[in-house]
Each structure stands twice: as structure tokens, then as C-alpha cells.
Swiss-Prot record:
It comes from Bacillus velezensis (strain DSM 23117 / BGSC 10A6 / LMG 26770 / FZB42) (Bacillus amyloliquefaciens subsp. plantarum). The keyword Protein biosynthesis applies. The gene is fusA. Pfam families: EFG_C, EFG_III, EFG_IV, GTP_EFTU, GTP_EFTU_D2. Belongs to the TRAFAC class translation factor GTPase superfamily. Classic translation factor GTPase family. EF-G/EF-2 subfamily. Keywords: Cytoplasm, Elongation factor, GTP-binding, Nucleotide-binding, Protein biosynthesis. The keyword Lipid biosynthesis does not apply. Catalyzes the GTP-dependent ribosomal translocation step during translation elongation. During this step, the ribosome changes from the pre-translocational (PRE) to the post-translocational (POST) state as the newly formed A-site-bound peptidyl-tRNA and P-site-bound deacylated tRNA move to the P and E sites, respectively. Catalyzes the coordinated movement of the two tRNA molecules, the mRNA and conformational changes in the ribosome. This is Elongation factor G.
Length: 692
């Protein structure tokens, strides 16, 4: 099947915003106008086309980025809907990674909100060109020019209006297009009919002013245009459009549009702006990768002629077809039924079927081309961030980096019979979401789940109940402590049981020493002359390794120690492996009084990004959490504080940071190293764990 839309006529865009700015409604209207939906679903009634997971419909927020394809004026527009809640930043990160451009939706009443800052920063990191849509112009308190101002003040963005609303709140009637210099009035409720008319008299002066400041702003980015402008020559509409496009593609300029998605006003003009100002796959820099065996850099251009390469950016379990892997094709073509190489994992994969998704309905296609976004059925080993490529021409594309989970919670099924079902459910959910982990705690046998925040784990537990019919009880968040020795000593372990019949006899002398941090447990056999027969040596090592798991102070694993077996004795009849295993564990217990054992806690490397005015409060808060501030720097108009803080003190930090900064602060943290717990705190933990 030949390519339906040329690369130049393809747009891969994301729609990004703060919670409640109207992002899902905007996407919904785009699908309506591009002829994909027959009835419009409202988010507040819980029936939107993109929000297709039940929890999203209940909570009225978008959690998973569904990829949808639409057509407008002979172009193909692939849309990825991204969530706006801070606990789902991984979803935003991964969708930005595969997009070429984005539409940032703002609420006309509030302008730039906290999460807009976070998403905007992420988009800047990935160099994503953006157009801005100031939505909800029909809302009480809507103020377009104030919203444009917040883009400049809070984000230092070179943003300029390319439209002007006619009226506001209930009187919002139409839109003035400053580029074409015409006005659009909406005549029917669906906003499908809007006629271009002359700009009303009372708006002419303001429109003229805004148009000249727009021309001046783009002229600054384009020398030829600047000369024309300074000489007072007329700048034509095509020249102005080309200059806006150039500035937008270079991520130096952000055109701002206006409307009300809910009232069907301005959405078609947003679609026009996507075609006019956002990049085609051929406008963005070619993607770089490395050859798996030699690590030499390879460039893949957006072209059907190049070898196939794609990035898997989302894995989902679908109720009808099983595992769906969403991927973005960067180069080459792929037919369904063919084999590809997952170069990240070194596995061969068969692509069973290829589906193009439309929110929650789907269409099967036989071939995908460079620049396309689609979902594959049948991939067994591919997870988020993996590269899929031609078997004969391997490449690993720059992968996505995901933050480490920051919160651990113990979970158990409400009925014991569901234990296995819960294990399967958690494994499937972990496959979909790289920031969600699941493990079994060897000391307590509990299942521990880890994620990006409380809402994140709530949703996981919720999905388990809905999709896998497993109900669970969730515990309070916990910290993974460790133990180690600070000094060395020679210790004896003797196990003797000789009372009639076959006895038990095992006797060892072991020298314990602290090992380097991160070196783990090392065992050395220094027996000479067979005082402990060779066949019992592995039993001594096994006995030590088993006992290390449960520590000596408070039942946490003992790490980073050396053990040298140097002497002992045996009995011809009564000695056996079991006896030496027990003797070794007794030696470890006896080491407690001589080797100065201490408790270690995970120390997190924390990075907090906040507006300058909250600097003092945040520094004080970090210090009160036993944190050490390691450094500070300015990033745009925000301040970054880097610190080392014990994980035990970081519980509830997301909530505290939100309230300390009115939701404008964000933070990331990951495990850095283990450090000794201060004595007074260690005593408390030991008491608690021994049940005293």
C-alpha cells in the first residue's frame, strides 16, 4: 500500500497543559472537526473519547497518553494526549520524546499554572516547538492578554498573540486573526461555520497595535524581514507566516491563539496553526543512535528509504488484543507480519499486526512509514524506551531516562487466594510503566510496590481492582535499611549436640572485617591441614550468606563485610553439612559484641526546582529533614537546590513542597548511597523492629 500522506504533510503533536485547562476537550474537538467523532463527549460528564480508562473518566483527569490519528486539509495529524498531573510526569516525558511539536493549552483565567511550568521545562529540554492555545475564553474572569503576559513573566517565553478575542466570558463571539488581518464570527453552536469578515471598528486600533508588535517580534529573528520592516516596506502575509514558522521551529518564538474548545470556537484555527507553524518529521533534526557492538554514532534521517528504526514509547494491556506496544517510526518502513530486532535487549521480535489507534477504536493497517505513530500487537520482550530496528542494520536510538520510584508501600491481597493473581497483575502493570516497580521483601515476605507518589500508587491499586479483579490492603510507606560492621574481630562458632545416637558437631573460627562500600560480601577459605574438611567449606559459606539476609541488629540485610574461615575442628562421625552451617551462623551472632555493627539508611540525591521567592523556606525545610544542601543554581527564572536527604525524611515531601510553593515547585530524587543512621534514631528503629 503506497504512502497516503507525504512526510511534509505529517504532523506529530502532543497536547500539553495543567490539570483542568481543557486539554482533553481540545483534543476531543480536534477529532470532531477532523471527522473522526460523530458525537462530542464532555469530560465533566465522563464520556470523552481520549479518556478511555475508567479511572480517568471518574476522576476527570487524563492518565495514559492515547495516540490518535486524524486528518485535516490533506494533512495527517497524529495526536498524543498527555496527562497534566505531577505524579504522571513520566507519561509526559515519554510522549514529548516522540513528538515533533506541541500545543500548550492554558486556562484564560489563570494563564501559566504550576504544572504548565513543569511540562514547559520538559518540552524545552527536548527542544519541542510549541504553539499556545488560550482556552476557556468563555469562562468568568477570562483575560487573554493577561495569559499571554504570564507566558513571558513566568516562563521567559518569547510569546506573542497571533489572534485577539472579540469579547470575553459570555460575550465571547469571535476571533481576530492578526496574521491574515480578518475577523471570524461563529454563527452556530458547533462552531463549524465561521465567516471571515472585516475587523469590527472598535477593535481596529488594538488589532493594529498587536499586529505591529507581532511583526516587530518576528523581524528580530529574521534579518531580511528586519531590513524590510525598518525601511517601512509592507510585509506580506506569506512572509509573516514564513517568519513565524521559522521562529517557532527554532524554538525561539511561540505564537499564541485563543478560543473556547467547550463552545467550539477557535479549534479549527488551532488545527490550521499546527499545519502552518509546527514541524513535519523532516523539519526536526535527524535522530542519533549508536551501533550496539561498536558504540559508533549513527544518524537516521526521516525517510522511507533509510533502514527501519523506531522507538517504543508506551506499552499497554488491551482488553481485546492483549499487549499493545505504541511506537514512533523514525526511518524506513515496516510491514505487519515481519520480524524486527529489539536492539536494546538483543531480541528478535515478530510484529503480528499493526494498528492505528483512534482514542479507543482501532484500524488495522499493513504498513507504517517514517514519521508514523502506531501500535504493534505480538511483541513479547519490548518495553518502554526500547529501540526496534531492521535486523540487518542495527541501531540503538537515544532512549528515555525515567526517574527512580520514590515511595515504597507494602501491599497484600484481601483474600489469600488472590496472592498469585496479584503477582501477575503487578507484573503486567510494571511492564506498562517504567516508574512503577514491584518486589518481594525477603525479610518479611511482603510484596512491596514502588512509584512516583501517592496518587500514582492509588491508581495502580485501583487498576488492579478493576482490570484484574484483585482487591488489596495497602500499608504505610517504608524505608529499606541495611546493616554493616565497623570493626573487625576473630570469632568462634561451635555447635555440639551429642546425646545418644547420631550427634551433631561443627566448629569454626572466622575473622570478620568491614569491606569497602558497595563491595558486598566476600568469603575466603584460609584452612590449612584439613582442620575443617573441604566438603564442609561450602556449608560454612552458605550458613553465613543465609544469616546475612536477616542481619544482627534489627533484622535488615548485612552488607559490605569480609569473612575469612581460618580454623576449626570436626568429629569423624557426628560432623555434617548442617552442623557447620549452624556453627557459621552462630559465629556471625557472636560477632555482634565485637564488630561494632551499625544501621545504614538510603540517602537520596534530591533536586528541587522552585521560583526564587520560596528559596528560604525550602532551604530551611531541607535542613529540618536532616538534609545537606550540596549546591544551588539558577535555571531560567527558577532556582535549583541540590541536596542529600535521608529517604526516611522524604515521605510526604511532594505534598509539603506543593503547599510550601503553592504547587509551583517540583522535585526529583534518586538513591545515591547508604550512610550510617545517627545513634538516637538507630536505637528507635532497632527497638521498633524487635517489637520492644
Amino acid at each position: 500500500m503506497a504512502r497516503e500522506f507525504s512526510l511534509e504533510k505529517t504532523r506529530n503533536i502532543g497536547i500539553m497543559a495543567h490539570i483542568d485547562a481543557g486539554k482533553t476537550t481540545t483534543t476531543e474537538r480536534i477529532l470532531f472537526y477532523t471527522g473522526r467523532i460523530h458525537k462530542i463527549g464532555e469530560t465533566h460528564e465522563g464520556a470523552s473519547q481520549m479518556d478511555w480508562m475508567e479511572q480517568e473518566q471518574e476522576r476527570g483527569i487524563t492518565i495514559t497518553s492515547a495516540a490518535t490519528t486524524a486528518q485535516w486539509k490533506g494533512y495527517r495529524v497524529n495526536i498524543i494526549d498527555t496527562p497534566g498531573h505531577v505524579d504522571f510526569t513520566v507519561e509526559v516525558e515519554r510522549s514529548l520524546r516522540v513528538l515533533d511539536g506541541a500545543v500548550a493549552v492554558l486556562d484564560a483565567q489563570s494563564g501559566v499554572e504550576p504544572q504548565t511550568e513543569t511540562v514547559w521545562r520538559q518540552a524545552t529540554t527536548y527542544g519541542v516547538p510549541r504553539v499556545v492555545f488560550v482556552n476557556k475564553m468563555d469562562k468568568i474572569g477570562a483575560d487573554f492578554l493577561y495569559s499571554v503576559g504570564t507566558l513571558r513573566d513566568r516562563l521567559q517565553a518569547n510569546a506573542h498573540a497571533i489572534q485577539l478575542p472579540i469579547g470575553a466570558e459570555d460575550n465571547f463571539e469571535g476571533i481576530i486573526d492578526l496574521v491574515e488581518n480578518v475577523a471570524y464570527f461563529y454563527e452556530d453552536d458547533l462552531g463549524t461555520r465561521s465567516d471571515a469578515k472585516e475587523i469590527p471598528e472598535e477593535y481596529k486600533e488594538q488589532a493594529e497595535e498587536l499586529r505591529s508588535s507581532l511583526i516587530e517580534a518576528v523581524a528580530e529573528l529574521d534579518e531580511e524581514l528586519m531590513e524590510k520592516y525598518l525601511e517601512g516596506e509592507e510585509i506580506t502575509i506569506p512572509e509573516l507566516k514564513a517568519a513565524i514558522r521559522k521562529g517557532t521551529l527554532n524554538v525561539e518564538f511561540y505564537p499564541v491563539l485563543v478560543g473556547s474548545a467547550f463552545k467550539n470556537k477557535g479549534v479549527q484555527l488551532v488545527l490550521d496553526a499546527v499545519l502552518d507553524y509546527l514541524p513535519a518529521p523532516t523539519d526536526v533534526a535527524a535522530i542519533k543512535g549508536v551501533r550496539p557492538d561498536t558504540d559508533e554514532e549513527i544518524v537516521r534521517h526521516s525517510s522511507d528509504e533509510e533502514p527501519f528504526s523506531a522507538l517504543a514509547f508506551k506499552v499497554m494491556t488491551d482488553p481485546y488484543v492483549g499487549k499493545l506496544t505504541f511506537f514512533r517510526v523514525y526511518s524506513g518502513t515496516l510491514d505487519s507480519g515481519s520480524y524486527v530486532k529489539n536492539s536494546t535487549k538483543g531480541k528478535r521480535e515478530r510484529v503480528g499486526r499493526i494498528l492505528q489507534m483512534h482514542a479507543n477504536s482501532r484500524e488495522e493497517i499493513s504498513t507504517v512509514y517514517a514519521g508514523d505513530i502506531a501500535a504493534a500487537v505480538g511483541l513479547k520482550d519490548t518495553s518502554t524506551g526500547d529501540t526496534l530496528c531492521d535486523e540487518k542494520d542495527l541501531v540503538i536510538l537515544e532512549s528515555m531516562e525515567f526517574p527512580e520510584p520514590v515511595i515504597d508501600v507494602a501491599i497484600e491481597p484481601k483474600s489469600k487466594a488472590d496472592q498469585d493473581k496479584m503477582g501477575i497483575a503487578l507484573a503486567k502493570l510494571a511492564e506498562e510503566d517504567p516508574t512503577f516497580r514491584t518486589q518481594t521483601n525477603p525479610e518479611t515476605g511482603q510484596t512491596i510496590i514502588s512509584g512516583m507518589g501517592e496518587l500514582h500508587l492509588d491508581i495502580i491499586v485501583d487498576r488492579m481492582k478493576r482490570e484484574f479483579k484483585v482487591e488489596a490492603n495497602v500499608g504505610a510507606p517504608q524505608v529499606a535499611y541495611r546493616e554493616t560492621f565497623r570493626t573487625g574481630a576473630k570469632v568462634e562458632g561451635k555447635f555440639v549436640r551429642q546425646s545418644g545416637g547420631r550427634g551433631q558437631f561443627g566448629h569454626v573460627w572466622i575473622e570478620f572485617e568491614p569491606n569497602e562500600e558497595g563491595a558486598g560480601f566476600e568469603f575466603e577459605n584460609a584452612i590449612v591441614g584439613g582442620v575443617v574438611p573441604r566438603e564442609y567449606i561450602p556449608a560454612v559459606q552458605a550458613g553465613l550468606e543465609d544469616s546475612l539476609e536477616n542481619g544482627v541488629l534489627a533484622g535488615f540485610p548485612l552488607i559490605d563485610i569480609k569473612a575469612k574461615l581460618f580454623d576449626g575442628s570436626y568429629h569423624d562421625v557426628d560432623s555434617n553439612e548442617m552442623a557447620f552451617k549452624v556453627a557459621a551462623s552462630m559465629a556471625l551472632k557472636n560477632a555482634v559484641s565485637k564488630c561494632n555493627p551499625v544501621l545504614l539508611e538510603p540517602i537520596m540525591k534530591v533536586e528541587v526546582v522552585i521560583p526564587e521567592e520560596y528559596m528560604g523556606d525550602i532551604m530551611g525545610d531541607v535542613t529540618s529533614r536532616r538534609g545537606r544542601v550540596e549546591g544551588m543554581e539558577a535555571r531560567g527564572n527558577a532556582q535549583v537546590v541540590r541536596a542529600m536527604v535521608p529517604l526516611a525524611e522524604m515521605f510526604g515531601y511532594a505534598t509539603a513542597l506543593r503547599s510550601n510553593t503553592q504547587g509551583r515547585g517540583t522535585f526529583t530524587m534518586f538513591m545515591d548511597h547508604y550512610e550510617e543512621v545517627p545513634k538516637s534514631i538507630a536505637e528507635e528503629i532497632i527497638k521498633k523492629n524487635k517489637g520492644e
